[in-house]
Amino acid sequence: MVVFSKTAALVLGLSTAVSAAPAPTRKGFTINQIARPANKTRTVNLPGLYARSLAKFGGTVPQSVKEAASKGSAVTTPQNNDEEYLTPVTVGKSTLHLDFDTGSADLWGFSDELPSSEQTGHDLYTPSSSATKLSGYSWDISYGDGSSASGDVYRDTVTVGGVTTNKQAVEAASKISSEFVQDTANDGLLGLAFSSINTVQPKAQTTFFDTVKSQLDSPLFAVQLKHDAPGVYDFGYIDDSKYTGSITYTDADSSQGYWGFSTDGYSIGDGSSSSSGFSAIADTGTTLILLDDEIVSAHYEQVSGAQESYEAGGYVFSCSTDLPDFTVVIGDYKAVVPGKYINYAPVSTGSSTCYGGIQSNSGLGLSILGDVFLKSQYVVFNSEGPKLGFAAQA
């Protein structure tokens, strides 16, 4: 476990700048998310969202969650705090609004290869004149809530912020399920996990980050997601104005293709810290925090009236309830998730019952620290090591 102060980071940054002087093309840049309020008819299937997160990592989706997702028994109309925050990316001749996902390794988007009925409301990927279609290559992704997408693969120009590559694998959707079609705010996904889990067949392709990291001042990106506001991604540098205190670093485990790491314990509310650490993944593409059953149960035991609802497919409670904070211990650093972040959303439009931002990992064997956790932190994803850095947001 290594801790860097802002001063040390500045010295390191100056050292890097000096050593990189002969290579003026190297750079760093910031790209902001934007709010994409969905149309008035859009709804969010909460157990469906939960099921997709479990299936993404090979977990077993409980029958109660499957049934709740299929029946639409916990479907809510997003309010302001549930807007989607997406990132504009130039792909081929198009600008798409993509979900940046550190838990997957594909760059895919809605395309003009889809039937016209499935294109409505979405920006579409159209290959540039210089694009090359990879003959015999394909991709196919499916999730636990029944959603899926598949199609062809191109090599094309992609620009994110100030960096462009003309050799990025772009996965063009030619088939897509209704779950994605209905989400008109979102045009696809840009994966930031390790390239080893890219799903393109017959040969996996590199992620955008792996393709362009040699152009960056440092082979890293940092994430500052925000509660009730668009977040920011910094590529190639660390912005010390976005965090307080010091950044605590820990080794990242990339053996499964994810940004995995080991925690050193946790605490709930004002309680003392447990020394029982757990293995976790830092995932911007998962909304919730998914933990071992004993931790989840311990958390909701401190929430008056909380119960595990078969109908809703997860833990629920009165929306007016004050929830305890949840703290993850990483070395000497304590990453605090405010209780208000864990009060995720009403289980249905106008309901006074809310769905918890912490849910069970269903025996997955590791915990997923998704956006509910990340919105309290400034997180550095450094491919050298690799390693992860955590600090409280400024």
Swiss-Prot record:
A Pfam family this chain is assigned to: Asp
Residues making up the propeptide: 21-69
Disulfide bond sites: 319-354
An annotated Gene Ontology molecular function: aspartic-type endopeptidase activity
Annotated localization: Secreted
Class of enzymatic activity (EC top level): hydrolase
GO biological process: proteolysis
Peptidase A1 domain boundaries: 85-391
Bilayer-spanning residue ranges: none
Assigned protein family: Belongs to the peptidase A1 family.
Protein name per the record: Aspergillopepsin-1
Source organism of the structure: Aspergillus niger
Gene: pepA
